[in-house]
Amino acid sequence: MADDDPAYVRARVPDYADYADEASRHHTDLVLRTFVGEHLNDARQRVGDELDERTSKTLDELILHCQFTDQAFIHWLDHARLDPPLVASLVAIDRRLVELAERVKDANASDLHDLLEAIDIAFEHRREPLPA
């Protein structure tokens, strides 16, 4: 994690509190998903008619993902002992999600698919510490 990851995310996502504070973990997840989802929804409105079927489907799936809590991730968060390196790892992934969402804001239809795949991968990376 870069030392500025938490500050970077907090500057763009109101009420982001990282995951070190057990009481705010759910809220942190919610505000992050809301931020990403709003950018995705804006892209849907801006270039939705220009998207191919595959990209449109991926966009819709990611918007839906942002609307609902990932139950496995939240359950893990509720019971995890997050040491500083693990918190740093999660915040770095969140920064990546924020950066990608900001790129979506200005992406044209032809660039959107690769960004959406990167967002999907970043969300999956948040789940990597979960026990198998």
Language-model segments: what does each one mean?
Residues 1-48:
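Leu/Val/Ala/Ile-rich N-terminal alpha-helices, chiefly Sec-type signal peptides and the beginnings
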Residues 45-129:
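Charged linear interaction tracts used for macromolecular binding and regulation
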